[in-house]
């Protein structure tokens, strides 16, 4: 039987349990607590206190998420979209992507090497296939175009 979240202590404990597993954004944590039946006024109070104590941080969440998704082979376009869907502010997302220190061209090249063994496309069909894959992964079209025309990557 799930725990009843009808007291501030229970809501805080559940929020801290979720944060112990991984970083969460405020919107995501609010959604999870509501799904568990916590009243909105208790959620807001608990999350405000966690922010004051430094236990809940949007910037840490953004940094963690960007780093994790980049290591998984996703590009800035895809990461930006996913964070937007999670209810984060556009300006904060852009700042996190600027501050992450990731060389997106290098990440694109590594992904392309891993998936296509560094073989430049020989015809339009193969070029479209590689381009679709890299675009789906969230890399900008201009970066993909440079790479597939032989002007990007290890230069």
From Swiss-Prot:
Q: Does the keyword Cytoplasm apply?
A: yes
Question: GO biological process annotations for this chain's record?
Answer: regulation of DNA repair
- Gene source species: Pseudomonas syringae pv. syringae (strain B728a)
Would the keyword Cytoplasm turn up in this protein's UniProt record?
Answer: yes
Record's family? Belongs to the RecX family.
The role this protein plays is: Modulates RecA activity.
Query: Where does the record place it?
Result: Cytoplasm
Note the InterPro entries from the entry. RecX_HTH_1st, RecX_HTH_2nd, RecX_HTH_3rd, Regulatory_RecX, WH-like_DNA-bd_sf
Q: What is this protein called?
A: Regulatory protein RecX
Could you tell me the keywords of this UniProt record? Cytoplasm
Q: Which domain of life is it from?
A: Bacteria
This entry carries the following GO cellular component terms, namely: cytoplasm
Q: Where are the transmembrane segments?
A: none
